[in-house]
Amino acid sequence: MVEQLTQHDPRRIGPFEVLGRLGAGGMGLVYLARSASGRRVAIKTVRTELAEDQLFRVRFTREVEAARAVSGFYTAAVVDADPRAAVPWLATAYVPAPSLEEIVNECGPMPTQAVRWLAAGIAQALQSIHGAGLVHRDLKPSNVLVVEDGPRVIDFGIASGVSNTRLTMTNVAVGTPAYMSPEQARDSRSVTGASDIFSLGSTLVFAATGHAPFHGANPVETVFMLVREGPDLEGLPDDLRPLIESCMQMDATHPAAEPRDLQAQLAPHLFASGSDDSGTASAWLPVPATAMIERRRGGRRTARRPPRPRPRRLRAAPQGPGAGHRLAQRGRPAFALPAVLALAAVRRVRTAAGPSAAPDGGPVQLPGAKVPIGPGRRAGEGRGAAAAAPRRRDRLGPAARRSERFLGGHGPHRTVPASTLRPGTPSPAPDRWRPWRFRMSNDVWGTPVVSGDLLYVTSFEVHALDVGNGRRQFKTRDVAWAMAVEGGRIHASDGPSLYALDAASGAEQWRLATDAWVYALKADRGTVLTATRGGGVQGWEASNGEKLWEVTGAQSDFETAEAGPVIHDGTVYLWQDARLRALDARTGLERWSYPIGDAASCGGVPVRVTPATDGYVYVAAGTRVLAVETGSGPVRWHFEAPAVFLSPPAFAPGPAVTGGGVYLADYLGTVYALDATTGKDRWRIATEARSSIEPVLVAVGNVHVGSGSALYTLDAVTDTPKWRFAAGGDVVGAPWWRRPGPLRLGGPRALHPGRGGRPAALKLATGGEITGSPVAQAGVVYACSKDRCVYALDALKGTGTGNRART
């Protein structure tokens, strides 16, 4: 979408008049411009830090000359460039067409023949690019435009020009982790055209399935999956597997297919006798996709719909002889479940008594409940629409046992991740603060941190933004995969090193090399805690980086930030040698340990720990929940469930009669309310299969849990269902609550009390799905979004800025 120019954008670049913004790429901003003759071009500019690198300028100049020589029907031709300008730029022919990413997000996965049609065109484009001596290095769905007569590959030249500069010498692999090759992730400076062929296979997987072949919670986890595990090919049609396997060679020493070989392989399928050999999109693509192409060609855009939900799948390993014979076998996924448990989850949901489907917008009658769960109004629906909504009472069959009631749904979908209670304060005064938005050059991930007058977010580096106006005060020089802010310092790691910066100025205070890659980092009361690949856990003095202690042999089955050790109130809790151990945070000396079991005995899922304010730590270990006294380690009680827990327990203080207790949901979606004193099961309600690793949300006597595309609210004392809100799509991120405002979802929505106590929706003013968890402080909501923006929103109204954004 073409956006209006800001006061910081140039009005002319070289001989071109700048008309608007097209977006932001990995190397810099992209503008729509017009030549003196009226020809429209797309101009890619280069980020300041790259422009200051003389090695980059030399290489970029050479690559631009090579890019000018690229000719081919399936590429966007280079029109002009100035590598020596203060801000280097490259202009290519503007193609008014949607990207492959946009088409799949809005219209769904493509048919087999359409994927082959795309593959043939992209392969021919790569043949032209490689013939000019270039390697694309960033082939992905957003860099493939789809027009009526075939795909167009864009953005070659800049990505290849950045290789061998200081950007790649700070452990940043050029390219997009979800689509790059393993050899590019290891060393992007020495890749060949075979790497582009691998990326072509990854792009085709997205086109055919709707999901990337590699996906993690953040880029570093995606790279880890890429080099250690192999691609996720779930949903890929069998007819396309030979094509994908010929592209995605996990072993770089194995000869990859050449572009001309792929074209020869595809030709018999595309132009067989009796087939439509026109070669146009209408011959291969579904009607919605061709309509979208036509609208874009005519300069019209429909209101953008959110991307189709992509469930986070828990996959069993391939079975049978020859399974994935040319693709490396996947290792254990970060939170993989044993196949028998995955099968049990499917059976549990599909065989629930009676029909399980409940219409969106209609009430759901729980067996044994006196009233149905009422639907909340969706965003944008007025009272008339709400009144016209169907009022069917779809019963779910015979009454289940009193202790288990099945809520309506459509099978095992990705659920609404939840977080623990976050206190809030009144809405900001309008005369002192206005909503703002800050656009990053790269993806933003993780949960933002507010400390004093600054907001800290991670987008490769740590960026410090003024909470009042969104202006960037500074950013770190180096990459930060993990970050914690505590005691006036930013503690961060780029993987092989750990460093501390002054939180107010960004000035470096200390830096040291670690013995292994840091995958988790936390800070508490002057101690920095890190977990490294291979089972290492270290404690560091926050003021100077002195190593206080180190232990080895900690669990290494689940090396993710969520499964890492926990530090709270001077105590470190870690999983080591099949025992849960409590260590002194300053000395590393063991205070107590408990035999929790190894990964196999814990159901193949990580142990999750929640330290609470009542002097106990609540532990979820496979199918078990334990309450352990934090001082000396005796177990207060033990609870056993029929399914494993992926998320940690949530603790609510107070007696059970007021909603106090321990709440959590297992993998099958059953929500449990446990008495914090005895561990007895006060009640349980089963929803749909749940793969969220976030805890349920307990606030003001209510338990909020996501199930598929709906959010259910249950009374924490009696388990009485209060309402059901149909979100209109799977909700991502974590819901949170602030007193006295609305309940907020991880996606761009908030729920306000409506008629009869049922919720009405208010859409938060963000431009994409929320990543991490939003944070509320002083009446402001801070959230990071998949549109590469950081938002500051009014916590009471959920409103934000318009289209303008600071950069």
From Swiss-Prot:
Active-site annotation: 138
GO terms for cellular component: cytoplasm
Swiss-Prot/TrEMBL keywords: ATP-binding, Kinase, Nucleotide-binding, Phosphoprotein, Serine/threonine-protein kinase, Transferase
E.C. number(s) listed in UniProt: 2.7.11.1
Catalysis performed (reactions): L-seryl-[protein] + ATP = O-phospho-L-seryl-[protein] + ADP + H(+); L-threonyl-[protein] + ATP = O-phospho-L-threonyl-[protein] + ADP + H(+)
Region (Disordered): 292-328, 353-429
Gene3D superfamilies the UniProt entry points to: 2.40.10.480, 2.40.128.630, Phosphorylase Kinase, domain 1, Transferase(Phosphotransferase) domain 1, YVTN repeat-like/Quinoprotein amine dehydrogenase
InterPro entries: Kinase-like_dom_sf, PQQ_b-propeller_rpt, PQQ_rpt_dom, Prot_kinase_dom, Protein_kinase_ATP_BS, Quinoprotein_ADH-like_sf, Ser/Thr_kinase_AS, WD40/YVTN_repeat-like_dom_sf
Residues modified as Phosphothreonine: 168
PTMs per UniProt: Autophosphorylated mainly on threonine residues. Some phosphorylation on serine residues. Autophosphorylation on Thr-168 is the major site enhancing kinase activity towards AfsR, and is regulated though interaction with KbpA.
SMART domains: PQQ, S_TKc
Record GO terms (molecular function): ATP binding; protein serine kinase activity; protein serine/threonine kinase activity
Binding site for ATP: 22-30, 44
Pfam families: Pkinase, PQQ_2
Coiled coil: none
Domain Protein kinase: 16-272
Residue list for modification Phosphoserine: 71
Domain of life: Bacteria
Compositionally biased residues, Basic residues: 297-315
Record's compositionally biased regions (Low complexity): 353-363
Function: Component of the AfsK/AfsR system involved in the response of aerial mycelium formation to glucose.
Subunit and partners: Interacts (via the N-terminal kinase domain) with KbpA; the interaction prevents autophosphorylation of AfsK.
Recorded family membership: Belongs to the protein kinase superfamily. Ser/Thr protein kinase family.
Name by which UniProt lists this protein: Serine/threonine-protein kinase AfsK
